[in-house]
Amino acid sequence: MMFLNPKQIIDNLSFLDSHMIACDIGSGSGGWTIPLAKKLENGKVYAVDIKEEALSALRSKLDDERIFNVELLLADIEKGVKIADNTIDFIILSNVLFEVEDKKKVLAESQRILKSNGRLLIIDWKKLNNIGAQDKAVLKENVIDMASQFNLKLKEQFDSGNYHFALVFEK
């Protein structure tokens, strides 16, 4: 496996069940949202992105694939999202932390909306010399440390492709 394979990673997350409520923060045009919505066929997925064009592209894909369990939210995660406290079973933050200025604010907001025992999957660039956003890459150990400040406990870690690390936390 070279680059990320969202469907394969989602299929391997044994804690997911079809009735869950999930949130894909930094959804872009749906690389994670679509396979997640299919997996959670009796649940719901919030797709959150700061870019209207990305959500518009995602809306078209959802319409084309006749996927109806996704709600699109235009929001800046660093300023908060309009999702109630303790309502989300599962959050995906894929390639988000390296992009944002205030990583702790993103983790605090994730912790706020997660239910007790909810899971947070963080996938981000490994620090490598030759590919990805190396100047902004975050160290896996720093993410684990920051998450612990918000009572997010590391449950699992794995490589997700050659260029990314994956961490699963529980609230």
Where are these regions (language model features)?
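A short acidic, Gly/Pro-enriched loop at the edge of an enzyme's catalytic core
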Residues: 78-90
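Core SAM-dependent methyltransferase catalytic element
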Residues: 156-171
